[in-house]
Amino acid sequence: MTKIQSIRSIRVSLPFETGGPRHGMRPSLDAWTKMECVMVRIKTSDGLEGWGEAFGHAMAPGSEAVINQILAPMLVGRDSVAINHRIAELERPLHGLGRSGPLMYALSAIDTALWDLAAQRAHLPLYKFLGGESGVLTKYASLMRYGGDTDAVAQNVERARSYGFRTIKLHETTIPAFRAARNAVELDLSLIHI
């Protein structure tokens, strides 16, 4: 049995700009100046290290706390190989904490790190271990929500296009905001919405 020896969380903070005032999560803030995520490193008794990432934004401190205070104590000393069983074993006693937010972000990081370890044991890159290439994936820019501010929408769509993106994801909810996005760029640019 290959046991989990340690789990470490590492908060990563990168410079970030929203491109203007935004609306949505923590709307009291005019703009973010950093983007955070939490990396997880799992070390095992066979000398390997697996890595995973927990979604961050404003939730990074919560995800980090879940990893350090809840999940790590439940996992250290346990088998690292039976991944689906291990994740299900974690989810059962924690179901009362919900199926979204920092708990799920933290579980996702643990899950990814365990699969990374399995791929290393198979001497394969993780993407090949999980089934290989699935074809061409189109990159896209995912913009913030600008609360219908058509000028901010147009500016940020144009900025994303200038960086080479041909597909842009909008979080806007009004028709004028979509019109502003469409009018800001050529017709061959694709717009998607969540």
Language-model features, listed with the residues they occupy:
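Structural preference for beta-strand elements that scaffold enzyme active sites
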Residues: 39, 138-140, 166-169, 188-190
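Alpha/beta enzyme core
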Residues: 151-166
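Active-site-adjacent beta->alpha loops and helix N-cap segments on the catalytic face
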Residues: 172-185
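Conserved small/polar residues in nucleotide/adenosyl-binding loops
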Residues: 192-194
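Glycine- and other small-residue-rich loops at beta-strand/loop junctions that grip anionic moieties
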Residues: 107, 170-171
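Metal- or metallocofactor-binding catalytic centers and their adjacent structured scaffolds
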Residues: 7, 43-121
